[in-house]
Regions:
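Catalytic core of pol beta-like nucleotidyltransferases
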Residues: 1-26, 34-40, 51-97
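Conserved histidines in hydrophobic membrane contexts and catalytic metal-binding motifs
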Residues: 29
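Structural signature of FAD isoalloxazine-binding scaffolds in flavoprotein oxidoreductases
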Residues: 48
Length: 97
């Protein structure tokens, strides 16, 4: 099971490296992993800022890289595209690595 502590202590450097390769900045975790309510089958939700000129293909690459690294289901959301109905909750939950 992926935990916030594991991400911070064991995977942070590699996650940041992968993010930079894909043009992702300000990597944060939100959802059940961030709140400590995750289970063994929980996915890991990442919130990122995408550099200008980057595309959805860069996000998809980052998502695939994270899936390979963590061995878990992953969601990657660009901060400007968070749905307005959940934006406040996502931003309140989001924690940096």
């Amino acid at each position: 099971m992926v935990t916030l502590d594991t991400l911070r202590r064991e995977k942070k450097a590699e996650i940041i490296r992968l993010a930079e390769m894909s043009g992702c900045r300000n990597v944060r975790v939100f959802g059940s992993v961030a709140t400590g309510e995750n289970r063994s089958d929980s996915d890991v939700d990442f919130l990122v800022d995408l550099e200008s000129g980057r595309t959805i293909f860069d996000l998809a690459r980052f998502l695939g890289d994270l899936r390979d690294l963590l061995g878990a289901e992953i969601d990657v959301v660009e901060s400007r595209s968070v749905h307005p109905h959940i934006r406040d909750r996502v931003l309140a939950e989001a924690v940096g690595l």
